[in-house]
Amino acid sequence: LMGTSLYIVQLTCQAKLFSARLASFVFWGWQLVIVSAAITLPLGLTTSKEYAELEWPIDILITLVWVAYAIVFFGTIAQRKTRHIYVANWFFAAFIIAVAILHVVNSLAIPVTFTKSYSVYAGTIDAMVQWWYGHNAVGFFLTAGFLGMMYYFVPKQANRPIYSYRLSVVHFWALISIYVWAGPHHLHYTTLPDWVQSLGMAMSLILLAPSWGGMINGIMTLSGAWDKLRTDPILKFLVVSLSFYGMSTFEGPMMAIKSVNSLSHYTDWTIGHVHSGALGWVAMISIGAMYHLIPILWGRKQGQMYSEKLIEMHFWMATIGTVLYIASMWVNGLMQGLMWRAVNSDGTLTYSFVESVEASLPGYIVRFIGGGIFLSGMFVMAYNVWKTTRMPQQLVAEKAS
């Protein structure tokens, strides 16, 4: 997201980065965050808050890096040569601002030692703030940010204008206005006040409209150029990612309905839902964007990789792997939910928890196979990228001709 946003903002604003040194700090600072997380998490040095596990010194580093990132991004927009700000930059801007607010508010803590702190919130309030953060981290980090990528790379790879620019503007304002209210659906049937749970459910259902508006806008950009899907495997990644986005954003509001949530909560269905977004939407649009960008970094035409057949092979491996992964978790989740709520005539549970785990084993095997296929596809991509970076210029010229 950082790389693509700083690339896109330069091209669409016709301006160089506000500060190359600050951008370099963002890169190396973020690598330090990753290394710090890789060291502290296995040692058990965590806050125990989902998605916000890192302790306070690393949280401060994240804040510094994020502020630098925001300065570079918005500074570049401020010195733009164009009057108009392209819609992709709107989504990136929302992602940067929202994640900053979410991170600071949810990570407020009282340090006890260098490696231990306690949240300033307690009980139900802590849970509410945590899932306001958790849901919107998904909403702005994994949705708004990647929609910014979509609004640039889909029309660019298809060589077509966005289907409806007006729809993209409506999509933007509707999404950022509604998304922030949907967090309570993670806390159905808890000590959270019932009206807050109901508000979260209602906002989640409304959220379906702007989400599908974005999906339709992306897919319909191919109007008049559907034949490109047969010949361009990079475009396949981008369009199929939108299909998974649509599926995931239909499933999310459905799972937010209290009666459905009573069956799905705590089961593998939730894991299937998350990975339809993480593998199907986030990973596949990122892969498509990388296939578009990597040749450009080495002075070639967009999408001009070493082997188009390997991209095609990777596409099918990623798609099949994702489908196996999420379908197995859907089946497991429904089965677990039904087994856990089954009772005998005297009110005792029909199945023990261990029996539900045993019944889930075939699904876990299918998930392992699907994940293995997806991972193997990434090795195919790594090989293709490695060969692309070593293509002699003569071969590049021949491929272009």
Model-predicted segments: where are they?
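Hydrophobic cores of alpha-helical transmembrane segments in multi-pass inner/ER membrane proteins
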Residues: 1-4, 60-74, 136-152, 204-219, ...
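Membrane-interface helix-loop-helix modules in multi-pass inner-membrane proteins
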Residues: 1-84, 110-119, 179-206, 306, ...
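Membrane-embedded translocation segments of transport machinery
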Residues: 143, 147, 161-265, 270
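Juxtamembrane/interfacial segments at transmembrane-helix boundaries in multi-pass membrane proteins
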Residues: 77, 83-89, 97-133, 150, ...
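Specific lipid-exposed transmembrane alpha-helices and their immediate membrane-water interface residues
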Residues: 102-111, 182-189, 242-270, 278, ...
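Short, highly charged, low-complexity non-transmembrane loops/tails of multi-pass membrane proteins
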Residues: 393-401
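Short aromatic-rich membrane-water interface segments that cap or initiate transmembrane helices
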Residues: 51-61, 123-139, 197-207, 265-279, ...
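Interfacial and helix-entry/exit segments of alpha-helical transmembrane bundles
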Residues: 17-33, 84-100, 158-177, 225-251, ...
